[in-house]
Amino acid sequence: MTEDKTKRSDNIEMRCADASVKCYSYEEALDLTGHGKYNIGLLFACFMVIIAMGIDIFGLGIIVTAATCDLGLNLQQIGILSSMPFAGIIVMSYPWGYLSDTRGRRLVLMWAMTGSFISAVLSSLAPSWQVLAALRFISSALSSAAESATYALLGECCNSRSRARYMLLMTSALMLTPTLYYVWGYFITKLNFSIYIMGILYRPWRLLTLVMALPLGIGAILLWFFNESPKFLANVGRMEEAVDVLRRMHEVNKGKTEIYPVQGIYLEEGSKEEVGQLTLRSLWLQIAPLFKPPLLGRTLLLYYLTFVIYIANNSFAIILPTIFNVFFTSYANLGPNSGSFCDLFYVASETPAPITNTTIIEPVIPECTDTISENTILAGCAHGLSFFVLNALLSQCAGRRKILTIVILVIAAIAAVLINVTGEAISGLVLFYVFLTTAMVFGIVSSYFVTLYPTSYRGMVACIGMMVARLSAFTGTNVVSAAITTTCAPTFYGTAALVISGAVAAWFLPSDSTEIN
């Protein structure tokens, strides 16, 4: 024990060579910066980056649907296009984690969002579906850096009192994205113009693609006004820069009249991560500690929770416009006596309608049209806005993350079981909405990636978590889209069992007061 104290003292001495300078731990120094304009501004910038990523990845369904006529897409080609964002995320999750931990959160975000913006803008001029697919793959691969690096950047610049609440507020950004791209899609595709430019026919779907790319550029510009994470700087040995950033945060938050007392800091774990080249060996050195004691248990637990909530939620959320369209179309045709929620999908499976696992505009369309169904828009907006508000309200309970996770998952599992049991379609739709509240757990799990891991591993563990999430969503989407019209009820029962297992796993999460610096 004495030896440990000596080693700890030596680490502090090494980081504060000047004996006349009082050293503060990073968390103490961060608390002294206060909470104010800098934190709120950074929250807004990161919020915009997350919105941009969500629109870039999840808004592609609207674009693909509107472009079907111009690009002459068949169902197989639509499926390939719709899968491009997930392919991009899966390929780049690992490298982004490494770069975030070794090159810097802000630097990675600025380059990634700028590159994604350029690729997304170019995709609006794609002459063929193959070029569109390639550019959207690049765009999503780059924008996917946002999901891990933004949480790390924001979490390391907020004091312990506001950190968990900010993490949950960040999830609200993803809840807001469907409303944005549904509304943009609705109004822009109502326009009627065709302009030949640079050898292509410029129609509304191309304008929509351009508009949906703008948040990527705006996010990159906003990040320019903020500094790198001071904790990252301290972790790689750039202590003076870290203190300078903390001093600037204090100045922005409290003004120039109050002097910032911190002149030296140290990281409590006394670790220093060397910045190396991006090689397979360096990547392995980053990931290996996550699957060894003492991190192994929490890594497996959090990755299982990630698997459960994403396969349960995104498997349905990604094809949500299709689900809404099938529901409202079948219900309009059959009326109140249409049977249960699942009965509507059984009826739809027997009707020769062009229903696929991507966004559907109209049930039967004799000719090409870019117009988006109003029922799909209204349902999508209601879902996005209500979840945004709900998540913002739940962020006020950030101090009770563990119990919140368990309660949400249990309620969602019960709703999934009852969806078809009620025997009535509208109540089934309401319960389906309740089931989708599993999305509220996204931010909670992300906050655990920040609080339960040392600084040098946070970017990597979050990025691998994102890879687990997207692989789960990709697999689940294909399973659900194939099963919901033939084995709808068993699909929900199986999902309910999976969600319950997630609630049981959440019971083993550490207490909310546990945090690793």
Language-model-detected regions and their locations in the chain:
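Transmembrane-helix signature of 12-pass secondary carriers
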Residues: 2-236, 241-247, 269-329, 357-358, ...
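Internal, charge-rich low-complexity segments
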Residues: 315-352
